[in-house]
Structure formats: structure tokens, C-alpha cells
Curated annotation (Swiss-Prot):
Keyword Mitochondrion: no
GO function terms (MF aspect): flavin adenine dinucleotide binding; monooxygenase activity; N,N-dimethylaniline monooxygenase activity; NADP binding
Crosslink feature (Glycyl lysine isopeptide (Lys-Gly) (interchain with G-Cter in SUMO)) location: K492
Name this polypeptide is given: Dimethylaniline monooxygenase [N-oxide-forming] 2
Species the sequence originates in: Mus musculus
Source organism phylogeny: Eukaryota, Metazoa, Chordata, Craniata, Vertebrata
């Protein structure tokens, strides 16, 4: 008899969890409190309590080839970075392809999840839900928590003396939808994350003046990298990940600084991070530097206090006649339907084995999917989490002892603090490629590069020096996909396809460029040789 699994939430984590359950022969039921799928990525004009909220102009920060599910590439004509509506379209295509909607009960809220009295032996759960005013209790063999962590706004008003007397408008960034109504205003955006940079850049096109207040600064990257390819297809390779792991910290820091300053000098723009040794997530924004050059945005230090109409900053400067303050200060999270004894959240910290499993449960039948913030795409990350969780539920994978899991949690937290710092915004941060490989190893889906080099050297080179995308984890192990190799070898054409909208005559510029590079290299070698000969 198939084990029954409850999936809480029908966002990206919930959808892929449903598919993984079906792939493993489990019987899933998904409870979604709203009327549709998509979670965070489904834009709505109004903010709704208990639901993630985005602004109309949001586009992905990770490219389509790095963000698709491992056995379902995005259509080749999709743009490389997707508007939220386009990403939602992909989710709909995905859900239809694998017939997932039949497992979802919409407008159904999970009230509580409790252990059954015989949990120590059965591992079962009682799930209480509410729909159309009626409550219902259902027993499940396992639970997948996919409710997200971008719902409860973090609004630290106590850190802003004088906010109670400020006459202007202030709100959290989750309430921002579009720039209409902000024309001609003087606006302060607090924070320097992706949302802060997006909102500040968008508002600066019609506002009288926009200020951005940041405590620590941030690296800012373009989505466009070398030769015009998406940034993450160049940044996230196994080779570059290996270098960041084995080289001395000072060398990695220097390399990172050089790479980040290649676009523009962050110190000149007032954005250089306070602690450059930390591998904090960079801001992805193609507009911010130009808006700073135009003077439409001005970078300020931390807010010291507010008056009725002005903002006083820590460096002593004052900006008068501020109309609006947007707090892009992140989110907190909790699980109101879970008892603290199951998953306890303290100061936005939670103790989960590999960011998924509560270590103290007698039976490993509850997993949190998506409670992580990788330095890369979240979509392949949650997919591997779901693949592992469903195999644990099925008994095909096992977890170590509670002592071992707790030791791993402590070690992982120490590494996180060492790499990313103690800031609240970095609490869920993790290295991208390392974490993917860690999960893949648990289910036997990590490629063996040594054997692959002898069997298929062309593919091995692509895997090691090319983008580390999700297709790699369908080459071996459970859930192999026969199209994985071809998807890896043809990703370049899917990147270029949406850009080929103008027919061009063939050009010899590429061969000439290549020849010039060869001649230049030859000239350097000859110059070095002649220098040795004393010419």
C-alpha cells in the first residue's frame, strides 16, 4: 500500500514535491490556502495576509537553464531571465505535463500538524485543515512543509528612533506593487538586497529623488556575464566552486573583489561591502549603477533618527522633506501549524539536518522543503531536497543518529557564519554547488567524474568546466532521464534561441577575432623568448 504524504503549499517547492512523490510511487495530497499554484511567483495586485507578495516588474535573478527542473527544460524560446508571469507559465506547463493539479486541494488551510499517539512506531501524522468553514482531520504517513519563508515581513521599527513622529508614509517592501502614485516624491529605501535595488531603481525613474540607506553595503552584479551569457552559467561551475573551496581565503576574497569591480568600482559608488571577506549574496541589478550616475539614486549610511519630515543619517547628513520610506528589510518565518517541539524557530534560526529534517524525531517522516537560500537558483535545490525526502519516506535512504545529525547542524552553522556572517539576511545562506552535490550524494545521483572522463570525456569536460545545472543529477542513480546528456550538450542553443530575432548575414568576425587572439599570444611568447636571449 502506497504511503500517503501531505504537501503543504503549491508554490515551486510544493509542485516539485508532488512530482517527486509520484515518481517514487507515493500517494500525495497538497493543501493550498489560495485558489491557484505559483506561490511567491504569482503576482496579485493586492497584498494578502499569509501569502508571499511580489511587485509587478519582478524578474528572475537566475537564468532559465540554471533554474529549470532536471528533467523538464524550459521552452527554448523563453527568455533567459523570466518575468514572474513567464515563470508562472512554466510552472503551469510543468503541472500539466505531469498531471499534478489533481493532487491539489485549493482554498484549504492547514490549521495544525500533530504526531499521532503511536508516532514512535508508525511515524504518522494527524493533519487538521479548514476549507469553506469546515474542519477536517486526515492521517498521513509523512509531511512535506513547502510553505515558504517570504511571508512575514521583518519591520524593525524600534531601530528607527522617531518613526512614530514621522509624518510621511512608510511600509514594508512586500506592499510595493508598481511605481504609480510615487511620481515626484522624495523616497528613502532602507536596505540593499535585490528587492531594495529593484524598487529603488524603478521608483527613481519618476520620483523626485530616491535615497538608499545601507548599513553594510553590497556587491552589485549584472545579469550579463562574459560574452553576453547569463552570469550564473559562468559563475556556477564545478571548477570555479573547487577553486573557491581550496584556495586561501585571502586569495578568494581578492578574486571576488576583482570580479565584482570589473563592472564598476564599488568604492566610488559608495556600495563596497563593509566586510569584503564575507561571501554575501551579491545584488543582481543592471539598472542601479546607471541610476546612481544619473543622480536619481543617492546612497546613504544607516539611519540615525527621523523627525517629522526629515531623515538624519549616522554620518550627520540630513535629507529634508522625505515623503515615503520603504523598508526592504527582509522577512522572518515561522510555522504556525507546527508545534515548537517539532520545528522550533528562534531569531530566524532553525535546527534542521541538512536544512531539511528535524533531528530529534523518532521517525524521519517530516521534511522542510525550500527553507534555504543558496547562492544560486532555488529551483534545482528544492528539487533535490524533495527527491531525497521522498526516498527517506519510502525507506530507500536512511538518516544517521540524532547525535550525528546535531553535530552536522553545529558544523554547518559555524561554516555559514564564517562564510556569510551573522546577519539575519544570511541565516539561510549556503554554498550552491556544494549543497547540490551533498544532496545528490544522498540519493546516488552525483556523477562520478573519474569514470565519466574515460567513458564520455566530452560530457565530463562540460560537467566540470561548464554550468552546474540540474540536468547533471539525472545522468546516474534513481530517476535517470535519457534526455539529460543531450540537454547538457545543447544548452547553449537554448540560451541563444530567444536572442535570434533578427536574421544576420554570416560574418567572418569570429574567425578573425580568434586569429587575432592567437597572434597576440604568439607575440607575447616571442617577446618573452627575445627577452631571455638578451635582444
Amino acid at each position: 500500500m502506497a504511503k500517503k504524504v501531505v504537501v503543504i503549499g503549491a508554490g515551486v517547492s510544493g509542485l516539485i514535491s508532488l512530482k517527486c512523490c509520484v515518481d517514487e510511487g507515493l500517494e500525495p495530497t497538497c493543501f493550498e490556502r489560495t485558489e491557484d499554484i505559483g506561490g511567491l511567483w504569482r503576482f496579485k495586485e493586492n497584498v494578502e495576509d499569509g501569502r508571499a507578495s511580489i511587485y509587478r516588474s519582478v524578474i528572475t535573478n537566475t537564468s532559465k537553464e540554471m533554474s529549470c527542473f532536471s528533467d523538464f527544460p524550459m521552452p527554448e524560446d523563453f527568455p533567459n531571465f523570466l518575468h514572474n508571469s513567464k515563470l508562472l507559465e512554466y510552472f503551469r506547463i510543468f503541472a500539466k505535463k505531469f498531471d499534478l493539479l489533481k493532487y491539489i486541494q485549493f482554498q484549504t488551510t492547514v490549521i495544525s500538524v500533530k504526531k499521532r499517539p503511536d508516532f514512535a512506531s508508525s511515524g504518522q501524522w494527524e493533519v487538521y485543515t479548514q476549507s469553506n468553514g469546515k474542519e477536517q482531520r486526515t492521517v498521513f504517513d509523512a509531511v512535506m512543509v513547502c510553505s515558504g519563508h517570504h511571508i512575514q515581513p521583518h519591520l524593525p521599527l524600534k531601530s528607527f528612533p522617531g518613526i512614530e513622529r514621522f509624518r510621511g508614509q512608510y511600509f514594508h517592501s512586500r506592499e510595493y506593487k508598481h511605481p504609480v502614485g510615487f511620481e515626484g516624491k522624495r523616497i528613502l529605501v532602507v536596505g540593499i538586497g535585490n528587492s531594495a535595488a529593484d524598487i529603488a531603481s524603478e521608483l527613481s525613474k519618476t520620483a523626485a529623488q530616491v535615497f538608499v540607506s545601507t548599513r553594510h553595503g553590497s556587491w552589485v552584479m549584472s545579469r550579463i556575464s562574459e560574452d553576453g551569457y547569463p552570469w550564473d552559467m559562468v559563475f556556477h561551475t564545478r571548477f570555479s566552486s573547487m577553486l573557491r573551496n581550496v584556495l586561501p581565503r585571502t586569495v578568494v576574497k581578492w578574486m571576488m573583489e576583482q570580479q565584482m569591480n570589473r563592472w564598476f568600482n564599488h568604492e566610488n559608488y559608495g556600495l563596497v561591502p563593509q566586510n569584503k571577506y564575507l561571501m554575501k549574496e551579491p545584488v543582481l541589478n543592471d539598472d542601479l549603477p546607471s541610476r546612481l550616475l544619473y543622480g536619481a539614486i543617492k546612497v546613504k549610511t544607516r539611519v540615525k533618527e527621523l523627525t517629522e519630515t526629515a531623515v538624519v543619517f549616522e554620518d550627520g547628513t540630513v535629507e529634508e522633506d522625505v515623503d515615503i520610506i520603504v523598508f526592504a528589510t527582509g522577512y522572518t518565518f515561522s510555522f504556525s501549524f507546527l508545534e515548537d517541539s517539532l520545528v522550533k524557530v528562534e531569531d530566524n534560526r532553525v535546527s534542521l539536518y541538512k536544512a531539511m529534517f528535524p533531528p530529534h524525531l523518532e521517525k524521519p517522516t517530516l521534511a522542510c522543503i525550500g527553507l534555504i537560500q543558496p547562492l544560486g537558483s532555488i529551483f534545482p535545490t528544492v528539487e533535490l531536497q524533495a527527491r531525497w525526502a521522498t526516498r527517506v519516506f519510502k525507506g530507500l535512504c536512511s538518516l544517521p543518529s540524532e547525535t550525528t545529525m546535531m553535530a552536522d547542524i553545529v558544523e554547518r552553522n559555524e561554516k555559514r557564519v564564517n562564510l556569510f556572517g551573522k546577519s539575519q539576511s544570511q541565516i539561510l545562506q549556503t554554498n550552491y554547488v556544494d549543497y547540490l552535490d551533498e544532496l545528490a550524494l544522498e540519493i546516488g545521483a552525483k556523477p562520478d567524474f573519474v569514470s565519466l572522463f574515460f567513458k564520455d570525456p566530452k560530457l565530463a569536460v562540460k560537467l566540470y568546466f561548464g554550468p552546474c545545472n540540474s540536468y547533471q543529477y539525472r545522468l546516474v542513480g534513481p530517476g535517470q532521464w535519457e534526455g539529460a546528456r543531450n540537454a547538457i550538450l545543447t544548452q547553449k542553443q537554448r540560451i541563444l534561441k530567444p536572442l535570434k530575432t533578427r536574421t544576420l548575414q554570416s560574418s567572418d568576425s569570429a574567425p578573425v577575432s580568434f586569429l587575432l587572439k592567437i597572434l597576440g599570444l604568439l607575440a607575447v611568447v616571442l617577446a618573452f623568448f627575445f627577452q631571455l636571449q638578451g635582444f
